[in-house]
Amino acid sequence: ITELVDEAERKVFQIADQGTRGSGPLRISDFLARAVDRIDILFHSDQVITGLSTAYKDLDEMTSGLQPADLVIVAGRPSMGKTTFAMNIAEHAAIQGDKPVLIFSMEMPGQALAMRMMSSLGRIDQHKIRTGKLADEDWPRVTSAVSMLSEAKMFIDDTPALSPGEVRARARRVTKEQGALGLIVIDY
């Protein structure tokens, strides 16, 4: 029955998309007026970060923040901190930016991500969190991190091996419930 519901939802979204798929290639002149309008808005703004702040000052200065509809790919060798980097940005977007954030974690269970975020926000060594060997002074920081995360509009889907269509359908469901998402992270 789940497959049937997913297929029906996919078909409904497919029908809805047919009216919004655009008109195909257009001349650049068709985009110039909107581009100039955007530049004018930015010119009159006192904001240095025009997108979503990443919490990484140098990165924000180079990119002006993550811009709507940007696709950002973080690449690196195994165990080089890609997940930690992405989760730090997600934490910042959800907590400091007060934006809904959706995380698809196809390799790591949601509980493990939550523990990493508690470690990060509480500034507690991950080894202590993983082993449960916390000192008395760590517990208030754990409580503070849990409080911040529980207030955040952060959603984790740790279903392994989702297809692009499934990711899209699930993102649309969360968008329908929460409004526009500030960030979608796919950790694969």
Language-model features, listed with the residues they occupy:
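Ser/Thr-centric signal marking residues that sit
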Residues: 54, 78, 83-84
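N-terminal cationic and glycine-rich segments that engage phosphates or anionic surfaces
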Residues: 89
